[in-house]
Structure formats: structure tokens, C-alpha cells
Amino acid sequence: MALSIKPGVRLLGLKPEILVGLQVAEGVYAAHGWTLRLTCGTEGKHQRASLHYAGEAVDLGLPPSGTDLPAFIEELKTALCEEFDVVLEADHIHLEWQVKSI
């Protein structure tokens, strides 16, 4: 697994489902020869109802400059099931697990 963790990232409380999503995302990064950088877990300041606090969201570092980001986001979405949301933010990729229906 080619994964690096930014210093200060808090892993305590991350749910198994988001860890599975992280593993799938790492595979997508690795297929391009890139290392996935985990930039945020359960720490930091987020919106009040953020899934980071529940351990159901993480932030990923962006791929190298020059990458077609919309295509890469679609690649991540395709690799993950519909219970995951992948959102391109200004300086990271937000990955969250959220059950859509029961």
C-alpha cells in the first residue's frame, strides 16, 4: 500500500467503512504510480455537521499537477460504491462514506 500520512492527522475514531474507501482510493492512486497522502482524518476544524467528526470522512492530497482532475475524480467514484462521495475541493479531495438508503 502506497500511503503516506501527513503529520498531525488523527486516525482515532475512523470507521471501518472509510478505511475500506481509503484502501480503494489508494489502489487508484497506485495505478497511476502515485502515493496517496492522507491529509485529514478526525482532527481539524470543519462544518458543524461534518462527517470528519464521526470518523466517516477523510481528506486526500491532490494528484500531481497536470492531472486531469475531473477525470481522476470520476475514476475514484467509479472504483468506489455509491455509498461514497468524492468531492474535489480547492486543495484536497474530500472522501466520505454516507449510507444513501437502507
Predicted regions and their residues:
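Extended, low-complexity, intrinsically disordered C-terminal regulatory tails
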Residues: P16-A49
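Catalytic cores and adjacent binding grooves of peptidoglycan-active enzymes
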Residues: S4, G8-L12, R37, K45-I102
